[in-house]
């Protein structure tokens, strides 16, 4: 049995990945700001804000680390307030960095792997995405820096999704017209789901010959122009 630390295990991609790990017999230490409602003998849960959490309760060995929290804050650039830039950065980048600091010793002890999440909007310039693209760009920089610094002991990778059908994206997919428009923007003519992103993330956690990579799982949006 392997042990994974999943930040943001309560919903969306983090929850889907947690369920995959538990289903195959792994142990999960989950941390979220509210209860997940998941019940499993191999799941240990902590309820805290990652920006304030002291790291107590982590096991001495971690085979894997997942940081799944994110934000969707889309608007014209001139409309962003300083606190919105700050919030997006804290949720997406600073939280990941602080969690990784807490987990580093245990990851090194187990020769483990870390998984973060970026967005297609970092490499594919998109209107109204300035704040999230800036924050997730920091995540990609963190991935590559730590992959170099922690090699060969710990691998670090990220998945970069496009719009995914999760609770976080419900406002963007909340009616048929919006959902159809979002699907049409993708070469594969649909949006992804949390299970598809979770399986991609699991592949990066499991493959011992991948590090420092950002894998686009985006329905072809980043590279195809049909």
Locations of regions flagged by a protein language model:
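Catalytic loop of short-chain dehydrogenase/reductase
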Residues: 111-138, 143-151, 163-164
């Amino acid at each position: 049995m392997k042990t994974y630390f999943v930040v943001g295990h309560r919903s969306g991609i983090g929850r889907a990945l947690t369920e995959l790990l538990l289903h195959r017999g792994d142990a999960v230490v989950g941390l979220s700001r509210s209860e997940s409602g998941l019940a499993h003998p191999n799941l240990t849960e902590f309820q805290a804000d990652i920006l304030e959490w002291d790291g107590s309760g982590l096991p001495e060995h971690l085979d894997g680390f997942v940081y799944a929290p994110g934000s969707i804050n889309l608007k014209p650039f001139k409309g962003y307030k300083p606190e919105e830039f700050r919030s997006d950065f804290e949720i997406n980048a600073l939280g990941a960095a602080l969690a990784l600091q807490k987990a580093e010793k245990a990851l090194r002890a187990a020769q483990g792997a870390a998984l973060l999440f970026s967005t297609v909007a970092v490499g594919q310039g998109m209107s109204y995405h300035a704040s999230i693209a800036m924050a997730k760009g920091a995540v990609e920089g963190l991935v590559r820096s730590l992959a170099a610094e922690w090699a060969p002991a710990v691998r670090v990778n990220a998945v970069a999704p496009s719009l995914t059908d999760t609770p976080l994206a419900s406002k963007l997919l909340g009616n048929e017209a919006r959902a159809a428009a979002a699907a049409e923007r993708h070469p594969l003519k649909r949006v992804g789901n949390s299970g598809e992103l979770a399986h991609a993330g699991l592949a990066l956690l499991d493959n011992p010959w991948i590090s420092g990579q950002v894998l686009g799982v985006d329905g072809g949006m980043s590279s195809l122009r049909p």
